[in-house]
């Protein structure tokens, strides 16, 4: 996902809103910090959807051409056209409800294409819950959340509404997170290859993702660990709390848990930022431990129902 492009579009459309938000985000962060020891209120509205990371070129290329990953997961290399004709080509590992999106240095334009850049989407399962998230954000001190609609072009030049996003701020160093809710127009388009709803108002992740995960080992992402600036971490905490995650301090960073996924954000300088680790649940227990070196990363699968993927910084 092109985080910089999304936020730049928002700034062009709503410059006054963005300018007014700079002072309010700090207040929201302070409120979130003060309440981190308390349990989240109400039902969970936002769930881990996906994270992306920009890796060194060696690792990105090794991932793209890995025969093992094509066995391990529902793996795709895909180019997507979004709002305003912006395009991105990513490497995707897709599970039942969650997925991982990986890029190499230079795959994305500008700031987003540098090593260590990363992002994360957390999404609703029921139509209308994004509005409640925005109410909770305002209660946390983010008085003017930034809204954005992403579209998708399936190749005919006609943009189809894809999802509505909300951000706490338009300012970030290397990492940003957004809340999102898939649009009914996207599910209604047969080219999206999505599933019928399981209940009225179903805009969930399982409906959005294909069922091809059943033919592979990987079932879902169970945790992600990313490093980002203290400012980026602080700006993410209100979104997680508004979504219903249980958030606690972890040194200079934060850990959020709920909905079967743990999100760890470590505060770090820019040269140490980026995607650090992802863990997965498997469809069936792996009888033996398998270690796969992929570029400057190491994926360990099994024994049992889990896998761990660690990403090293380039030398």
Which residues make up each language-model segment?
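Amphipathic alpha-helical segments
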Residues: 60-76, 133-139, 230-247
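Vicinal oxygen chelate
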Residues: 48-59, 81, 93, 110-231, 243, 270-295, ...
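Secretory targeting and sorting signals
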Residues: 1-34
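Polyanion-binding and phosphate-handling cores
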Residues: 70, 89, 99-169
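N-terminal beta-strand motif that seeds the catalytic metal site of vicinal oxygen chelate
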Residues: 37-63, 186-233, 278
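An N-terminus-focused feature that recognizes amino-terminal "leader" regions
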Residues: 37-109, 114-117
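Phosphate-end processing signature that detects enzymes handling 5′-triphosphorylated RNA
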Residues: 65-68, 72-73, 124, 128-131, ...
């Amino acid at each position: 996902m092109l985080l910089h492009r999304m936020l730049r579009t928002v700034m062009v459309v709503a410059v006054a809103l963005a300018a007014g938000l700079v002072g309010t985000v700090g207040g929201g962060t302070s409120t979130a910090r003060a309440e981190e020891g308390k349990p989240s209120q109400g039902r969970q509205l936002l769930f881990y959807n996906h994270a992306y990371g920009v890796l060194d070129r060696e690792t990105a290329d090794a991932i793209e051409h890995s025969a093992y990953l094509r066995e391990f997961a529902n793996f795709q290399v895909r180019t997507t056209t979004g709002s305003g004709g912006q395009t991105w080509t990513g490497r995707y590992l897709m599970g039942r409800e969650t997925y991982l999106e990986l890029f190499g240095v230079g795959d994305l334009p500008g700031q987003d294409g540098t090593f260590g850049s990363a992002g994360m989407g957390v999404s609703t399962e029921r139509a209308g819950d994004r509005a409640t998230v925005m109410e909770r954000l305002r209660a946390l001190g983010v008085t003017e959340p930034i809204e954005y609609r992403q579209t998708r072009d399936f190749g005919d030049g006609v943009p189809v509404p894809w999802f509505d996003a909300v951000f706490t701020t338009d300012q970030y160093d290397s990492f940003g997170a957004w809340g999102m809710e898939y649009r009914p127009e996207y599910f209604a388009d047969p080219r999206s290859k999505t599933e019928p709803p399981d209940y009225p108002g179903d805009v969930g992740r399982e409906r959005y993702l294909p069922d091809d995960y059943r033919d592979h080992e990987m079932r879902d992402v169970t945790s992600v660990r990313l490093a980002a600036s203290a400012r980026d971490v602080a700006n993410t905490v209100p979104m997680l709390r508004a979504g219903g995650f249980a958030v606690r301090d972890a040194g200079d960073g934060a850990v959020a848990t709920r909905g079967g996924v743990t999100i760890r954000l470590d505060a770090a300088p820019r040269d140490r930022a980026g995607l650090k680790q992802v863990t997965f649940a498997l469809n069936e227990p792996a009888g033996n431990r398998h270690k796969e070196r992929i570029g400057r990363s190491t994926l360990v699968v099994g024994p049992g129902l889990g896998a761990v993927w660690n990403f090293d910084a380039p030398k």
